[in-house]
Amino acid sequence: MEQTYVMVKPDGVQRGLVGEVISRIEKRGLKILALRMNVIAEATAKEHYGEHAARPFFPSLIEFITSGPSVSMVVAGKDAIKVMRAINGATNPVDAAPGTIRGDFALDVGRNVVHASDSPEAAAREIAIHFKDSEIGKYSRVDEVCLYE
């Protein structure tokens, strides 16, 4: 079963959208294997978003991500990366379809509520940045037989 990393960013936490995000994840048949709310340290944020280090928006991105609590999750399920990115919607909320998290709640591209890994490699890297293996649970949903026949 594929795993991905998901973060409800500080704007999503501050706007009370954590429960909404979790509900949408679980309603799509995905399961949450790990969850933590914390203020991400600057060094961790820089490691997570390192591929953007040369971009002009990098300093403001790091400032935003470390500005308040966020919720980090390990989410698993069949095609979890693809499904989670579909749930999130396009990065720019102008392009995000209604019914997606960003289409329904994001205010602008810099305050777009949620992050999810975009590839298996990114998922493995991001999960390792935010969680130890011992913090990731293992369980079966009672509906997995129906979901993954």
From Swiss-Prot:
Chemical reaction(s) catalysed: a 2'-deoxyribonucleoside 5'-diphosphate + ATP = a 2'-deoxyribonucleoside 5'-triphosphate + ADP; a ribonucleoside 5'-diphosphate + ATP = a ribonucleoside 5'-triphosphate + ADP
EC number in record: 2.7.4.6
A Pfam family reported for this protein in Swiss-Prot or TrEMBL: NDK
Coiled coil (UniProt feature): none
PANTHER family found in the cross-reference section: NUCLEOSIDE DIPHOSPHATE KINASE
Family indicated by similarity: Belongs to the NDK family.
Alphabetized NCBIfam families for the sequence: PRK00668.1
Protein name listed in UniProt: Nucleoside diphosphate kinase
Natural source organism: Methanosarcina acetivorans (strain ATCC 35395 / DSM 2834 / JCM 12185 / C2A)
UniProt lineage: Archaea, Methanobacteriati, Methanobacteriota, Stenosarchaea group, Methanomicrobia
